[in-house]
Amino acid sequence: MHADPAIRPDATKLDIEVFRLEPHDWVPNNRKLPVVLYRNALQIDPDIDADERAAAIEALFEEHQWPPRWRDSIFDYHHFHSTAHEVLAIVSGEADVIAGGPGGRVMHVRTGDVMLLPAGTGHCLQSASGRFSVVGAYPAGQQWDIRREALTPEEWAEMEGLPFPPSDPVLGRSGPLIVYWLRAGRI
């Protein structure tokens, strides 16, 4: 792993939360793949500014075949992506993010946390503080969409047929994606 020293993934400090979300109203979530929340995934040097942090996270994701696509916050309305899995790294600040659609599970995230959302997972920013900023990335070859309505049966089948990413966005050839997603794919 060649991560920028400004952000150092440290598997020994990771606290992993894994959970599945059932379909909820118009939000499909993902029946096979769990949400993976990497707490303390990135040991971020507090002396570097947010732009340097974001660039270092982008380099890490790029190295692991998850090309970064944007820097911003998370939309404050419920939505999901049907054409791509998504990884979100918290560059600065902290927030409460709802996963699963309206009435879903609230995840409190802070600087250095990473959220891995399988395609179909509803998410929405509930509240944020401390100049909340995120880097968003998607597996190589997957183009994200923004959905706010139910999928057709054909779209649902396409979503469930998306290929597995080739590596974990944080740890590469090892890590939670390999453990939890590949295991789920064999069920």
Walk through the language-model features, giving the residues of each:
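Conserved metal-binding segment of the jelly-roll/cupin
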Residues: 109-129, 138
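A short, N-terminal "cap"/entry segment at the start of jelly-roll beta-barrel domains
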Residues: 1-79, 178-187
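Short, conserved beta-strand element in jelly-roll/cupin
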Residues: 81-98, 116
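Double-stranded beta-helix
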Residues: 67, 73-74, 92-94, 102, 126-187
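A short beta-loop-beta micro-motif enriched in histidine and acidic residues
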Residues: 73-87, 102-103, 110
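A generic structural motif
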Residues: 98-100, 126
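A generic "binding-loop/recognition-motif" signal
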Residues: 94, 103, 121-122, 130
